[in-house]
Every structure is written in structure tokens, then in C-alpha cells.
């Protein structure tokens, strides 16, 4: 290199961030079902890391379980799906606005340890492949660097139906 060129692959590898406003533009989920607070690293068409600050005030803790609050595993999987949906929308770009990401399948879901109030869930999602409008992902959720859940899942990217928000 002669020192004048730009190394775009290094810039892409650094990724970018998406705040809560960007997440809410990208996906339709809202309280109490919006399960990511920010995306701290996103490399379009490759991977994303979402963050969920798990608060004792989460509505699901009222019944899961009183006196021993544990985040339901299916909601950890949903946080993985929401992180992947932001990755898809950021990859497709604004020209594809109006698309919705629907779960198709979940494989090999494993839950390694409970997620409790005060935990910061870091959701690492990597695109395995996509063919047409079907995308497949691998994900691992971690707390303090320790894996708490993992799954492989597929999603279909579709147009919003008329009348859908």
C-alpha cells in the first residue's frame, strides 16, 4: 500500500452501532416485546452484537418466577431473532424499507445458565447463509463473557401486508 488508499475491509470489520431509535425504525417490536436495547457492533451481511439490559422491572418476571426471577429461554431466543432482524434490515438498506422478518425455524437451542435481573445479555448473531428471502443464523447469548444460550434459526424476509404498522 502506498499510504493513500483506504482499507475498506478493515473499516467494515470494525462494524457500526445502532441505537434504540434505529432499532425501532428497523423492527416493529415495542414494549413489552422489544428485547434488545442497542446493537453495539454490526457488519452488514455478516454479523451483529445486540445488547439487552435485563431489569427486575421486566414484565415477564412477575410470573417467571415469583421470588426467583429468571428470563424465559424463549425470550432469549427472541432477542437473538430481533438482533438478526436488525442485521437483515441494515444489510438490505433503505431501498428495502417495509420488509418484515418472520421466524421459520429454531434448531439446536441450548440454555446453559439462567439469566436474571441485573445481567447484561450480549447477543452474538452471525449470518450462516441466505438464499432468496430465507436467511439462516447462528447465535450465542452471553453474560459476562459466559455463554447462557445458543441456537441456529432461519427467518423469511417478506413484504408487510397492507394495513400492517
From Swiss-Prot:
Cellular component terms per the entry's GO annotation: cytoplasm; membrane
SUPFAM superfamilies given in the database record: Thioesterase/thiol ester dehydrase-isomerase
Subcellular location: Cytoplasm
Keyword Lyase: yes
Catalytic function, reaction form: a (3R)-hydroxyacyl-[ACP] = a (2E)-enoyl-[ACP] + H2O
Active site: 64
Protein name listed in UniProt: 3-hydroxyacyl-[acyl-carrier-protein] dehydratase FabZ
Organism: Acidiphilium cryptum (strain JF-5)
EC annotation from Swiss-Prot or TrEMBL: 4.2.1.59
Family: Belongs to the thioester dehydratase family. FabZ subfamily.
GO molecular function, one term: (3R)-hydroxyacyl-[acyl-carrier-protein] dehydratase activity
Function of the protein: Involved in unsaturated fatty acids biosynthesis. Catalyzes the dehydration of short chain beta-hydroxyacyl-ACPs and long chain saturated and unsaturated beta-hydroxyacyl-ACPs.
Keyword Lyase appears in the UniProt entry: yes
Keywords: Cytoplasm, Lipid A biosynthesis, Lipid biosynthesis, Lipid metabolism, Lyase
Gene3D superfamilies, sorted: Hotdog Thioesterase (3.10.129.10)
Record-level GO BP terms: fatty acid biosynthetic process; lipid A biosynthetic process
Pfam families: FabA
